[in-house]
Amino acid sequence: MTHTLRVVFAGTPEFAAAALAAIHEAGFPVPLVLTQPDRPAGRGMKLQASAVKRYAVEHGMPVAQPPSLRRAGKYPAEAADAIELLRSTPHDVMVVAAYGLLLPQEVLDIPRDGCINIHASLLPRWRGAAPIHRAIEAGDAETGVTLMQMDIGLDTGAMIEEARIAIAPDETTATLHDRLAAEGARLIVDALVQLERDGVLPATPQPADGVTYAEKIGKHEAALDWRKPADVLARQVRAFDPFPGGVATLDGAAIKLWAAEPVAARGEAAPGTIVEAAPEGVVVACGSGALRVTQLQKPGGKRLPAREFLAGSPLAAGQRFALTDVA
């Protein structure tokens, strides 16, 4: 089916690429795609295009990669050029998903039907940069995707639609990301169909209660504090897969932990002490309970099940992982 509603799309990672693909496949014209500049990545630190750029180029969509959209920012000339490009590109609505750049009011005012954001949480919970990670880390039973009409605030716009998803007990950020990306893609296509048909999308202001912020994930958060309860550490490991991983330090070597589950405590061992090193998993004493680690990675190695890891990197009961410094 071919649609007439013209959509400018702004987004960067895989989460956004799923939405762009759905919009394109549904038949909406996309006269312009905005995405962040190519960044160095990988071991060779070669410039790599974003997932959104790769999709757009493969499907013949015009792409712009301004480093900023704020005239008063660090790149005023580039921002001015991008804003002029937006003004000169005929379109009706802008869809924004994990773009990573601030949109000033001047940009929000350009599309006739405004800017719609696809956000990976049930707003107003987990506004900000890392809503998927933080929902798992906090032990939330459910999360979802919210479509909102963007305003100048940080994820504060009126809500158009939402979809709720239960968080599975073994959910990682990687698996939850893919489920939420699919939901976001479905929601935005339905919303664009409605907007084209009705000329308006009803929206409800976000409630004042229940606001939380999902701070960007930092590499420093990877270190596991064994003084914490085992269930908290298990959530941390799941939340930080694929980035930055959970890290435990043994004799100066940083071992990444990729899969773990809380189990009952084994005796009175001090936090961080390995109490069992078996093919089924490495059990480590925690502040309360213990953590059975079933997937590990040594520096420079691959993720391995505990059985394979132990075959090449033996661990033994009584060894103790270092405790992180308490801030």
UniProtKB/Swiss-Prot annotation:
The keyword rRNA-binding does not apply. PROSITE patterns: GART. One of its GO terms (cellular component) is cytosol. GO terms for molecular function: methionyl-tRNA formyltransferase activity. Coiled coil: none annotated. It is an enzyme of class 2 (transferase). Gene3D superfamilies: Formyl transferase, C-terminal domain, Formyl transferase, N-terminal domain. Keywords: Protein biosynthesis, Transferase. It catalyses: L-methionyl-tRNA(fMet) + (6R)-10-formyltetrahydrofolate = N-formyl-L-methionyl-tRNA(fMet) + (6S)-5,6,7,8-tetrahydrofolate + H(+). HAMAP family: Formyl_trans. NCBIfam families: fmt (TIGR00460). Attaches a formyl group to the free amino group of methionyl-tRNA(fMet). The formyl group appears to play a dual role in the initiator identity of N-formylmethionyl-tRNA by promoting its recognition by IF2 and preventing the misappropriation of this tRNA by the elongation apparatus. Belongs to the Fmt family. This is Methionyl-tRNA formyltransferase. It comes from Burkholderia lata (strain ATCC 17760 / DSM 23089 / LMG 22485 / NCIMB 9086 / R18194 / 383). The lineage of its organism: Bacteria, Pseudomonadati, Pseudomonadota, Betaproteobacteria, Burkholderiales. The gene is fmt.
